[in-house]
């Protein structure tokens, strides 16, 4: 399995429950809205509306991005799978696109909540002159995957450096 080399694992299984993290009201409200949409996905689908399928969590280290992702997954009764993209980049350059796609396909099949940690490691602005061609191709892979993410799953990304993330990813 290609995804096994990417350390895609059910990193946190808080389905028994996890207390709501202490967050600013605006952040708590935005995350709560995503949870409510996901919980009401059948009612939304009956009206031809798709729930939120992806979100980017932003902030400096230690602010609670991973804890927030855990809370979202727990509230939805699903485990949180974490894919550390920094590790992916350091170990698999040359095969990263295929392996990333395999990991994402695996997560789709299991309707998991998937957190792409350190999204800025691969989803850099395509205008970055210092970037190598493979990284630019990875941005394209990520954009295609986000566009095709099923309503049954939730794709989260986390970054400490929002200014490095390709603007096209923000629009999704």
Give a label for each model feature.
Residues 1-17:
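Interdomain "pre-motor" coupling segment immediately N-terminal to P-loop NTPase/helicase cores
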Residues 19-22:
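ABC-family P-loop ATPase nucleotide-binding domain
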Residues 26-32, 36-172:
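Walker A/P-loop NTP-binding motif of AAA+ ATPase domains
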